């Protein structure tokens, strides 16, 4: 099982009050002691209507037990990966830098800068226009009899 998912299930198990009063926190310590999340216990859920009853209180524990019994999912790679090292990994120390070419993309920096300036100016103009409209509305309110 994924460690983050397992940690979520552990917290769910530790901080979910059970209607029958079983203290699961005493039986199962948290998996990751270094990075414990600050979680406060929530009030018990009392089923108000429908098919829910106190017999359904252990459904979460059953799901966690099934997940524990199945174990970790197999590592599956996307098609075409073929076990090759990902591009984000550092090259090996003995490897030559020519084996990892630097991706040089053409960036049209001046047009991006001009676009950024135009958008910023437009936002400022729209904001200033809104303020001036508000002032004009306030100033003319007496003449309109408002």
Curated annotation (Swiss-Prot):
Q: Where is the composition biased (Low complexity)?
A: 84-93
Keywords for this entry? Answer: Host nucleus, Phosphoprotein
Q: Where in the cell is it found?
A: Host nucleus, Host nucleolus
Note the InterPro entries from the entry. Answer: Herpes_US8A
According to the record, the residues making up region (Disordered) are 63-93
Top-level taxon in the UniProt lineage: Viruses
Keyword hit for Phosphoprotein:
yes
Q: What's in the GO CC field?
A: host cell nucleolus
Q: How is it modified after translation?
A: Phosphorylated.
Q: Which family does it belong to?
A: Belongs to the HHV-1 US8.5 protein family.
Question: What is this protein's name?
Answer: Protein US8.5
Its source organism is Human herpesvirus 2 (strain HG52) (HHV-2)
